[in-house]
């Protein structure tokens, strides 16, 4: 970790009280840099407000509740990710996660129809995500994880997708679009609004499997969705700071926020992620007020309406 850059004191102060809405902590089936409790303790030391635990494979609301008990100064929030490990588009899984205190529902990630890399035979030497290695290992062991559809062949959301959206609306949870493709994102967002979902966030819109243009991002922001720009993907060289900042300038900062998406052992410490991003934004010419909105205020506005 000593090889990673250190955030400035100015950036640390600007992100004080922030929520990181997308982190990968242990225990997990994929190796992580810290466990939930260690992460909460580090957030407390840095004056950060809270974080959402993401697992591609299991609900995290129970882990979050225990972490809040042990580190009450930090609001640790749980979630569920609708991959095959929880039954895919499974409204019962969402209902149980909500009753256990979950704050956020990610739509499919590793099992999204839009993410075939984990279902294809691996290409020797290819640079693939950590989770894709897990998918390949499972297939080698005869455990098949098929794609989770959210729309039909005509692009209309499936009945089970609407049932999930109704459960999200009922419990006032946050909907995150995860690894859906562009057309799926628009279909799901429009259906979510029809079903009464109040909080929607578009997960890493610049990520190659989403690749939303600036006009697309603006159209989603006009619908009331937040745009979650993730820092880990920049470190993994999936896209650049310049692209993200250009898109934010196009859409305006009101519906944009940054999350780290950190927790991978090769990456910077989770608790440094937002401050490192704030330093980049300052260097790119954003004002302190704008940086505070992008890295703290907007994520708090999204998170503080959640039940946990």
Task: Please provide the spans of the model-predicted regions.
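An N-terminally biased module of ancient metal coordination in phosphate/nucleic-acid-related enzymes
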Residues: 1-74
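Histidine/acidic-residue-rich catalytic or RNA/ligand-binding cores of hydrolases
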Residues: 29-33, 61-63, 186-191, 211-217, ...
């Amino acid at each position: 970790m000593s090889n990673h850059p250190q955030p400035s004191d100015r950036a640390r102060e600007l992100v004080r009280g922030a929520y990181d809405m997308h982190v990968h902590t242990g225990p997990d089936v994929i190796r992580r840099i810290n466990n939930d409790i260690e992460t909460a303790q580090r957030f407390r030391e840095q004056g950060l407000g809270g974080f959402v635990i993401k697992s591609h494979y299991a609900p995290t609301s129970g882990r979050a509740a225990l972490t809040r008990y042990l580190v009450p100064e930090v609001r640790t929030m749980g979630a569920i990710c609708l991959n095959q490990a929880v039954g895919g588009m499974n409204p019962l899984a969402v209902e149980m996660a909500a009753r256990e205190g979950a704050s956020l529902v990610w739509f499919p990630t590793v099992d999204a129809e839009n993410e075939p890399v984990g279902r294809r035979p691996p290409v020797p030497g290819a640079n693939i995500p950590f989770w894709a290695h897990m998918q390949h290992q499972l297939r080698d062991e005869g455990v098949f994880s098929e794609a989770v559809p959210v729309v039909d062949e005509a692009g209309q959301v499936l009945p089970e997708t609407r049932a999930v959206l109704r459960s999200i609306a009922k419990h006032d949870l946050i909907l995150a679009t995860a690894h859906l493709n562009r057309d799926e994102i628009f279909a799901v967002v429009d259906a979510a609004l029809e079903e009464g979902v109040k909080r929607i966030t578009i997960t890493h819109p610049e990520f190659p499997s989403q690749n939303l243009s600036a006009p697309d991002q603006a159209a989603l922001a006009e619908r009331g969705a937040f745009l979650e720009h993730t820092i880990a993907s920049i470190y993994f060289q999936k896209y650049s700071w310049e692209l993200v900042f250009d898109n934010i300038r196009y859409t305006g900062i009101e519906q944009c926020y940054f999350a780290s998406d950190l927790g991978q052992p090769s990456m910077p410490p989770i608790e440094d992620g937002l401050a490192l991003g704030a330093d980049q934004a300052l260097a790119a010419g954003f004002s302190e007020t704008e940086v505070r909105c992008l890295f703290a205020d907007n994520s708090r506005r999204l998170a503080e309406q959640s039940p946990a």
